């Protein structure tokens, strides 16, 4: 027997994602890459660290954006500074340790500005820090990365925590 009645479905409503939502989307989408790259043998650890640092930046900015820090996260001294973003998130009551863990500090050292003399972004570019005119010293990042598997686990936990926090 066939029912020929018409069903009335509610209208589908979609909203434009906010910038904060965008940060969360990127963090979530980078996470599988971090997890896979952290366990593959014979792969340079820089690949996992670079993507992990970007995922960490995005998840912290998602939390801060949703907590009204839209302008603060763009300040030059904070923008790519994972330690500063971590501390801001702690100050906004994200349930994380007050002091960033070593893996965060190490990621921060390769991810953003590490010198008053310029933007270094060591994970992205293998360039040295050029000191002020007349000083020919060139400092190159040593390539340190965190222990990858524990880092990936902690980033997953943080993403899950922030997802719950921004839904409140």
Regions from the language model: what does each represent?
Residues 1, 39, 60, 128:
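Residue-level marker of positions within ordered structural domains that often coincide
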Residues 35, 45-67:
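Short, hydrophobic, well-ordered secondary-structure elements
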Residues 2-20, 24, 68-168:
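Long, charged low-complexity segments
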Residues 13, 17, 41-50:
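Short, charged/polar micro-motifs that form catalytic or ligand-binding hotspots
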Residues 27-46:
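A long, hydrophobic alpha-helical segment
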Residues 23-26, 51-52:
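Amphipathic alpha-helix face/heptad-repeat signature
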């Amino acid at each position: 027997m066939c029912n020929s009645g018409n069903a009335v479905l509610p209208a589908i409503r979609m909203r434009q994602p906010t910038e904060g939502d965008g940060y969360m989307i990127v963090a979530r989408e980078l996470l599988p890459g971090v997890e896979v790259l952290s366990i593959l043998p014979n792969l340079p650890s820089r690949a996992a660290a670079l993507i992990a640092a970007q995922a960490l930046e995005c998840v912290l900015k998602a939390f801060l954006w949703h907590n009204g820090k839209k302008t603060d996260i763009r300040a030059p001294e904070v923008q790519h500074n994972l330690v500063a973003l971590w501390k801001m998130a702690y100050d906004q009551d994200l349930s994380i340790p007050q002091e960033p863990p070593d893996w965060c500090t190490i990621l921060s050292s390769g991810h953003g500005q590490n010198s008053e003399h310029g933007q270094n972004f060591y994970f992205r570019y293998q360039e040295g820090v050029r000191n002020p005119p007349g000083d020919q010293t060139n400092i190159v990042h040593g390539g340190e990365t965190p222990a990858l598997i524990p880092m990936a686990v902690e980033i997953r936990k943080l993403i899950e925590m922030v997802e719950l926090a921004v839904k409140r």
